[in-house]
C-alpha cells in the first residue's frame, strides 16, 4: 500500500499552508495545520525541543489515523529538525524552500534543511505545485500492470 501521509515542511512564511490548502482538495485529503492543532489541541505545548518533538509526534499520529481510514492526510508545519521529522514518522516529504529566513529568529537558528525529501518546492506558486504534486502523487498510487498481475497470483 502506498504511503498516503504527506508532510509539507519549511520555514514560517514559505507557503506551506497555502500549498496544503491547494493540494488537499485535489487528493481528497484531510489537512492538519500545525498552528491550528497547537492552538486547539496542544496549547499546553511550548517551543522547547522536547515540545516540538511531541507536537511532531502528535501531528504524525493524527495523520496516521486518517490514513488508516483510507484517506490522504497532509500536515503542514515547520518541522525544523531531523528529530521532529523522525517523530512525525514515515511520509512523503515536501520541502517548501522558497525563502532563506522566516519570521522568527529562533526558528531560523534551529531550522535544519532536510537531507531527505521527496519533493522540493522552490517558488511560491501553490496552484502550479498543487496540480503537479496531485498528478504525480495520483500516479504514484495507481497500480502498474506488473503489480496488478503479481497481486492476482
Give residue spans per PLM region.
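Conserved substrate/cofactor phosphate-moiety recognition/catalytic segment
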Residues: 20-62
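Glycine-rich phosphate-binding loop used to anchor ATP phosphates in small-molecule kinases
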Residues: 48-104
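Short, charged, surface-exposed secondary-structure boundary motifs
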Residues: 41-42, 101-111, 129-132
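The conserved Walker
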Residues: 12
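NTP-dependent small-molecule kinase module
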Residues: 1, 6, 22, 26, ...
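Residues at the C-termini of beta-strands that transition into short coil/loop
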Residues: 35, 97, 122-125
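Conserved lysine of the Walker
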Residues: 16
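Residue-level preference for the first positions of well-ordered beta-strands
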Residues: 3-7, 30, 72-74
Amino acid at each position: 500500500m502506498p504511503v498516503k501521509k504527506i508532510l509539507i515542511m519549511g520555514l514560517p512564511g514559505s507557503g506551506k499552508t497555502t500549498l496544503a490548502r491547494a493540494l488537499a482538495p485535489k487528493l481528497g485529503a484531510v489537512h492538519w495545520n500545525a498552528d491550528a492543532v497547537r492552538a486547539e489541541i496542544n496549547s499546553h505545548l511550548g517551543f522547547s525541543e522536547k515540545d516540538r518533538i511531541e507536537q511532531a509526534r502528535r501531528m504524525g499520529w493524527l495523520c496516521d489515523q486518517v490514513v488508516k481510514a483510507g484517506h490522504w492526510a497532509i500536515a503542514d508545519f515547520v518541522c525544523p529538525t531531523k528529530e521532529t521529522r523522525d517523530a512525525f514518522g514515515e511520509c512523503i516529504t515536501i520541502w517548501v524552500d522558497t525563502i532563506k529566513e522566516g519570521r522568527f529568529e529562533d526558528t531560523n537558528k534551529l531550522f535544519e534543511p532536510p537531507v531527505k525529501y521527496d519533493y522540493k518546492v522552490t517558488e511560491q506558486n501553490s496552484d502550479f505545485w498543487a496540480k503537479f504534486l496531485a498528478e504525480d502523487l495520483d500516479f504514484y498510487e495507481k497500480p502498474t500492470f506488473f503489480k496488478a498481475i503479481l497481486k492476482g497470483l
